[in-house]
Amino acid sequence: PIFYRFDDPELHYIIIGFHPPRMVGIFFPERKQVMSLMNHDHPIIRQGWDPDRIALSCVMLEELLQVNADAVDQYCASADSHRLVLTQAFRPNVGHQLREEFSLLWKLYTKTDCDAALLTGPFDVLELARQLPDTIPRESVTFDESEVPWPVNYFNAVVNRGLFLGRMGCRSHMPLEMQQALQAGFRTEHPEAFDEIQKKLKNCWPVVWLTLRGHNRKWIGEGFHLRRLAETVTAKYPKAGFILDGLPDVRESADEILASQATVIDFIGSRFTEAQACFHLADAYVMPYSNSCTLHMVNPRPGVVHGLKGWIPDEPFEPAATESPVMARVVHGVKCETGNESYDAWVTTCDYQ
């Protein structure tokens, strides 16, 4: 959240969150009360800041009611000495981090004289903080979620450290200069992996990146279908090469594809930053609608994104706004229930006809 302070009629903070319309709540320190706004089409967003609309449209946000009352009192009493920091990587989703946080942070820190400190959260799996200038004052926060949810820990980090948080939170275009800087940065971090894959793919064309997924949004029969795809492409383009990407839980599908006669490079289990570095070698891709789309955001190229209708766009789309758009094609799947309610509640198994 980013907290805006208003002294009249009552001291309160507007809490700006992670998803549109960004404003998700109002904190009243005197009452130790947090109210939330969850409607994307809320009249406050469309028509202004009428207090009556605020009062009529709020509901209690239970998690943040667990805030330490003494810490809040101390925070409010010492407001004049609070430090402004910009935040990054407090939300686990790296796609949101990249297109909604980092693009703005990069512009602020490289194109302006912004000297605010950077507070990095526990979810910087792309190590984006390292892609910003070394001169930035910075610190990091880790959370223990064993007792309370991370939003509460986040709020406690604010009050205990005496911070004003500025959280980047809008969809911002990704300049070509920034994309090129990220590409070069990832390759500099992983030169050995890049060189090894490049050597294995010498004289291969086209090179197709295949991202596998074994947990939610997985593709039933993924190994069989992608093996058939690799063999079909190879029949038409004998020098084609394929790079397999994914977490270790896709090993069974990966082995099925590796058993084909196609030229297939096993890159399963690589670090996310290694994948970003080596994605530069691909001419096209096939991947699920997931954090994998950050590969396209950093290094756009033609490809196919698959997922359930309603979860992904209906038409070709751009995962992040760029200066030179490259659209991702879309393939929709059909949800298949397993009959296991606890499994189906959090895993979407997709079957593509």
Language-model-derived ranges and their functions:
Residues 119-131, 210-272:
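Catalytic donor nucleotide-activated moiety binding site of glycosyltransferases and closely related
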Residues 275-318:
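A donor-sugar binding/catalytic signature common to diverse glycosyltransferases
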Residues 83, 207, 241, 283-284:
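Structural motif
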Residues 59-152, 293:
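Active-site and donor-binding regions of nucleotide-sugar-utilizing enzymes
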